[in-house]
UniProtKB/Swiss-Prot annotation:
Record-annotated membrane-spanning stretches: none
GO terms for biological process, alphabetical: translation
Keywords, in A-Z order: Ribonucleoprotein, Ribosomal protein, RNA-binding, rRNA-binding
Name recorded for this polypeptide: Large ribosomal subunit protein bL9
Sections of the chain in a coiled coil: none
Role: Binds to the 23S rRNA.
One Gene Ontology cellular component annotation held by this UniProt entry: ribonucleoprotein complex
Presence of the UniProt keyword Methyltransferase in the record: no
Gene name linked to the record: rplI
Family under the similarity heading: Belongs to the bacterial ribosomal protein bL9 family.
InterPro entries given in the database record: Ribosomal_bL9, Ribosomal_bL9/RNase_H1_N, Ribosomal_bL9_bac/chp, Ribosomal_bL9_C, Ribosomal_bL9_C_sf, Ribosomal_bL9_N, Ribosomal_bL9_N_sf
Keyword Ribonucleoprotein in annotation: yes
NCBIfam families noted in UniProt: L9
Length: 171
């Protein structure tokens, strides 16, 4: 299937790119999400005319996202959970819970689909989580999962100590 991107798509292309993609990918993801349109002759002509509008709109969105990104960057989210004796959680910390807490902290609604977890968070510790608000912008947030508030503070102190040791070694 040949498509024209109307929004930037990570690892695929930018606005106005004409690409060949698998039929299922185009039909089930790109078209319903309004990330692309079919590459017919009338659409190709339309995109040539409207490419500047799409790029201006994307630039405006990107500027808003950069402001939000500045708020999100370096956030530390603490989750206090019950665990077994060996530190395993009863359940897990989900991307929805991370999105809700982050939205609460920055006073901006962040969707759970923007939270990228490498693996499920099922034990206590410190995790780095990627927040993808735009195809070209990512932020990293620190998630701390602990049994109590004092344990979370211990994790933070431990993290600061490791960071200062790393800086001393590199100097």
């Amino acid at each position: 299937m040949e498509i024209i991107l109307i929004k930037p798509v990570r690892k695929l292309g930018k606005i106005g790119d004409i690409l060949k993609v698998a039929d299922g990918f185009g039909r089930n993801y790109l078209l319903p999400q309004k990330l692309a349109i079919r590459a017919t002759e009338p659409n190709k002509e339309l995109i040539v005319k409207q490419k500047h509008e799409f790029e201006a709109k994307d630039k405006q969105i990107r500027e808003e996202v950069e402001k939000i990104n500045a708020l999100i960057k370096d956030q530390k989210l603490v989750f206090i959970r019950q665990t077994s004796d060996d530190g395993k959680l009863f359940g897990s910390v989900t991307n929805k819970e991370i999105a809700d807490k982050l939205s609460e902290n920055v006073s901006y609604n962040i969707s759970h689909s923007n939270i990228i977890l490498d693996k499920q968070i099922k034990s206590t510790g410190i995790y780095t989580v990627e927040i993808r608000l735009h195809a070209e912008l990512n932020a990293i947030v620190m998630v701390i999962v602990a049994r109590s508030e004092s344990e979370a503070q211990d994790y933070l102190r431990e993290q600061k100590t490791e960071t200062s040791e790393d800086l001393a070694e590199s100097a």
